[in-house]
Structure formats: C-alpha cells, structure tokens
C-alpha cells in the first residue's frame, strides 16, 4: 500500500502524476483549521505534506501523528515550526538551489528600475506627460561603477555579485556571518561590518532569511547611516525590515529610493504609504516567479518528498540529523 501524502498546492499534471506513482495523494485547498477539521481522517493518516505559503505549526502537527516528512516549494521556511518538526523527527525539505539565478535577476531588475526610475517614468508617459524633450526632473542615476553593498552573501548574493561585478563594473561590499573567500577572489568583494557597508554603499541589497536574529535587523538606526543618495533593495524576507522605519526614512529623504519584493505583511495593504511614493518600486514577491523556475521548484519539491520518505536526505534537508 502506498504511503498517504497531502498536497496543498496545485502541481503541473506531469508532476502530480510523478507524485501519484509513489504515493496516494490527497489534495486540499489550504491548511486552515477548517480544512484540517473537515479532512481529519486524511490528515491523521498522512505521512507526507507538500505545498507552499501555509503555516505548519505545532497545532497542525498534533493532527498528523503519522507525518514523517514535509516538503515546501520554496527556499524559505520561516512559516514552519522547525523546532516542533525536529522534536517529532519530521524531515523538512526545501528548494534552495533552483531559484538562485532567477532571484538574482529580480534583484538586479530592482536595482535598475529604481535607479533609472523605469516604473515612474513609464507611468508618466502613459499619463500623457511626455510632451517635449525631457529635462532633469525625468533623470535617474547611474548604476555602473557605483558601490553595491550585499547583506547576506549566500547563493543568491553570489549570483547578484556576479552580475554587478562583470555586468556593471560595480565595487562590491558585503556583510555576512563569515568571510566568503570565493566572493573576494572572483568579484574582488570586500568584507566589512554592517555600519561601514551602510555608510559607503550606493545600493544596499538585503538578502537574508527571517530568523529571531534577523527580525527588524534594519530599522531607523540603519537607514540613518545610509547615504541620502542611496537606494535600498529588499528581496529576502519582509519582516527583516521595520517597514515603518523604512517609510519614515523615505519620507524624510534619509535614503533616495527603495525597490521592494517583500513586505512585513503580504499582500501589501492598498493603503500603505509605500504605494503613494514615486521613488518606491513595489512588486508582489516575484523573486522566483518565472514559469521555468516555478516549475523547477515544484519538481524539486516533489523529488524531495519522494527522497525523504525513502530515507534519502543527502540534499535539500533543513534538519537531516533527525534521520539518524
């Protein structure tokens, strides 16, 4: 008899078929308490869980006594109670490598669109404001040869550094938990403390996961240390930034502009002050959102769940020690 798994995110037909070759698959719309209650028998028997964008906490795990592995279609896993999973010896799988290049593309797009005011001036053209040769009020700022500060030199940080160094001749500063020898050798990146990075960078790109240590890492104190001409980019996790402090910094002119792919609350409220600022490019968490990459992430998540329930945790496992 095949193990039972719960799928709470739609998959392409071929990937669903692959999953069904190994498991009895039960599809649900979400992991809300109502859904769990309505499908209590299914949740009670499930050994695997696959999906994204839903909280997996201790309360849910109580309803799933046979759960052995969870697989998220994402690199981030801050919506999972890792301690509760680990205490139950439940494996948590994620997709850390598939989306690296695509997210780095998004970061570079935010750098370019904020610096050159692409969204703002495109909207002005559509509004009929281009009636003569443009003047300084339409101008942006250069990207090439400007200093890029990267906070978080992981896979995505490295991919961004590659684009910035070879494509735009940008000097690179970085701050991370440890020195990154490859970044220093390949891109001439310079490690520095966070204060120095903030003070010297023309673009500050934040690429950090959300943890207890990184929550509101960026607040009023950090924005006050940045150049008034600097542009802030966040494509990591929204709550790493105190959004009210960011809004205040933009309103006071402490920083020049911001390109944001993530927010403290998602979707972003329609009455957020960020949406009324011409110098803010706000996009709806599109970091990995291409057809190719989202398919690749889903395929990876399917393979991860198959591997996990077969006891294979050599890659893409957040807590592999629970399999010992």
UniProtKB/Swiss-Prot annotation:
CDD domains, sorted: GDH
The annotated active site, in chain numbering, is: 237, 266, 285
Task: Give the superkingdom in one word.
Answer: Bacteria
Q: Which reaction does it catalyse?
A: glycolate + NADP(+) = glyoxylate + NADPH + H(+); (R)-glycerate + NAD(+) = 3-hydroxypyruvate + NADH + H(+); (R)-glycerate + NADP(+) = 3-hydroxypyruvate + NADPH + H(+)
The enzyme's E.C. designation:
1.1.1.79, 1.1.1.81
Q: What is the native source organism of this protein? A: Escherichia coli O1:K1 / APEC
Q: How does it assemble?
A: Homodimer.
Which GO cellular component terms are attached? cytosol; plasma membrane
Q: What is this protein called?
A: Glyoxylate/hydroxypyruvate reductase B
Name the family the entry cites.
Answer: Belongs to the D-isomer specific 2-hydroxyacid dehydrogenase family. GhrB subfamily.
Localization of this protein: Cytoplasm
Principal location class: cytoplasm
**One Pfam family linked to the record:** 2-Hacid_dh
Give the Gene Ontology MF terms in alphabetical order.
glyoxylate reductase (NADPH) activity; hydroxypyruvate reductase (NADH) activity; hydroxypyruvate reductase (NADPH) activity; NAD binding
The taxonomic lineage of its organism, from the top, reads: Bacteria, Pseudomonadati, Pseudomonadota, Gammaproteobacteria, Enterobacterales
